[in-house]
Every structure is written in structure tokens, then in C-alpha cells.
Amino acid sequence: MRHALVVAAAIAASAQYAGAQALPNCDFVFENTPVTTLTRLAQPSGLYLTILGRGVVVSCAGQSNRISADSAEFNEELGLLLLIGRVHYTEPQATIDSDRMTYHRAEDRLNARGNVVATMSSGSVMRSPETDYFRAVVGRPVSRTVAIGRPQLSLVEPGAGGGAVEPVVVLADRIVLVGDSVVYASRRVDITRTSVRANSDSAFVDSQREFVRLMLSPVVTGRGVRPFTLRGGVIDLHSRERKLERVLATPSGHVLSGDLELLADSIDLRLVDEQLQQAYAWGPGRARATSPDRDITADSIYVSTPNQRLREMHAVGDAFANSIADTATVTSNERDWISGDTIVARFDSAAAGDTTRAVPRDLTATGSARSFYQFGNPQGVRERPTVNYVRGRVITIAFADGEVSTVTVTDQASGVYLEAESLTAIPPARPGESAPQTPPRSPARPGTPH
């Protein structure tokens, strides 16, 4: 104790001798240990360079912080305290361990280097080769932690009811932590949590608001039973009670989830229990939804995916859907299609035991509806299909086993139904007989409206 008082008194006397102005926020008190060694070297300015070894303990007078290290050097003229070997800093807001540390008294900034581990009062942990810690002092009410050299932050978020949950892990070239809840990450950002992984060039995280913004080539990947991948210019993630509820990508949104691929200027995903349930696509450009054998485009598209299984699509505004013709009975370069002001498509699972692939149940086009579908002809010639083209206010196409079963037209119905001509071979003429004539082609028969 006597040794600590002697060291503190010597340094205070040096500052007074130099006629120094008011001390910065931290006035060092060297408590030290019974075996601490002390060497003081006078500088031309009249201030001293103090070297301490064999165990050092330092604190700020009247403050709840403390630093311990193997050795230290205090330059009064520069206001720098250099600590070397097993450095351990503590205060109510944070604990920092490192191989070396420099305390800049004028800024109340700690620069820690070598195996730095900074632990916040919330339990969040930053690991890096170098970290600057700006203490919360007068004029800076919130602490700031700046880590470089590809740091890793384990951000602890309180769970619902106050219980702890798995931390969010942030990896980047540079991370700034404001307080213990706001994060700015830049360059090669990788954010991982239980059900989702996000990558971007820069990111902002506010754990109190449960909000994340990803910028510059962001990608979000859902890691549940049925994963999804979302891309866009900027992606926002909103959570509630630490569960992801909404993901918004704009511009150039692109999502891929099992049966569904969705492209639009803006894409909004809604999740329940961190499983994709709904998707909205809209923007100045056209929205496009693609399932295994079908494309739908419109001004905007709504997709229902309960339990992340495709069930419905609503295409609004000059909607157009096309699909590959029935390959079992038709060989054609033409695609089947249906259009209208609005198209609603409903889907089922392929089979009771196969819920990973959706097949169409029915499509309904409303408002100036038109449709073009091809069927196998009676002769079984795949290259010459039967064609059905109809128009009406409402057109409903029902499917059986994924293939067109019936086409129903309601109001203002018109159209044509064309069968391929008979391909029956005509026998050659016998001697003395004239060749038989080709039977006349059947007249076009319009489809029967219902």
C-alpha cells in the first residue's frame, strides 16, 4: 500500500512541477503489487518517463476501472500509458484482454493489440488482432469499440422473456460496436444466426430494434428445412422476439425457394416461425414468378407458401402465364399460355409422399382473358397437336396430374378448336382407275363455352 502511494504521489508531483493544465478525464493511480519495480527518467520538458515491472495495477482516480499487466511505461509528456504482457482491463461496461495495450489519456482511448478479446456487459464478445476502445466519458456518453483485422463479433441478444439465445455472429474486415447493441460492419461481411446467413459488403445491425440492413451485393440464405436464397441491391431484415419475420430486398430483388423463383424490383418475404409463408413482388419493372414448368409475369405478384410449400400465386396487372405443352402427347416449340388482367394459380404437392414439388391444380384468368393450349391429336402424332384458343371475361383451366383437363370460359366467350387433319394413308390407284381424292378437311370447330 505504501509503495502504491509513493508512485501515485511521484507522478502527481511531476505534473504539478510542469505547470500542467487540468488533467484529462482519467487521472492514473498506480496501485501495483508488493514486488513492482519502478524506474523514473526525467525528460527535457521536466516531465518523467516512468517504467514499471514485475506486475502493474493501474486505475483512474474515482472511477470504476482497473488495468493489470506484467509491465508498463507511462510517458507523462505524451499522456500515454503502454502496458505489456497479459493485459487485463475492466470497467462496468466492458472487459478487454490482450497482449499489449496503450491508453491514450487525452482521448480516453485504449488501443489493444494481439489476441484481443473484448467482452461487453451484455455478454457480447469481440475477438480481433487489434481493437480501439473509446470509453464512455463526458462528451461521449456511449462507448465505442472499433476492431480491425477481420474481427469476429458474437452479438448476444436477450430472448423473449429475458432468456439468452444463440448469439448472432458477425465477421467482417472492420466492425464498429456502439454501446453493446449497434453494429457497423464493412468489407466481406458474414452474419450468421440459427436460421439464416447473410453476406454483403457492408451491414448495419441494431439488436434493440431487431433490425439488420445489408448493402452492396447482399445475399440472405434461409437455413431451415426448406432453404431460400434472396438477393437484391439493399436487403432489410426485421425480427420480433429474436425470430425473423420479414425480409425486404430492393432493387433487383431475386428469391429462390424450392419450387419458386421470384424476380422483381422489390421483393418482400414474410415468415412465421422463421419459415417462408408469403412473398410479394412489385416495382417499376415487371414481376416474374417461375415454378418448375410455368412462368408468370405481371405488374405485381403475391405468392402464398404455407410451411414453405407453394400453394397460390396471384398475378395482378396485365398478367401472363406460359408453360411447356404436355410432353407426353405433344412435341411443339410453342408454349401453352393464358393471359388476363389478373391470374390466380393454385398448386398441390406432386403426391402424398412428395411435398417438395408443386403441381398446378387450376389457373383462373379474369378480365380480357385469353388462353392457348395444345393437346395430343386422335391419331397420336405428337408433332401435330390439337389446338384450343379461347377468349372471354373469365377463363378457368383445370389440371389433372399436372396436365390440362378442362378449359372453362365464362361470359363473352369465343374461340376456335382445331384438330389436326387425318393422316390415314391413301392407297395407290389400280390400273385403269383414277386415284381417289383426299377427303375434304373438317371445318374448324369453335370451343364450346360453358
Question: Residue locations for each model-derived region?
Answer:
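Bacterial N-terminal signal peptides
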Residues: 4-15
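N-terminal amphipathic/hydrophobic interface segments
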Residues: 19-450
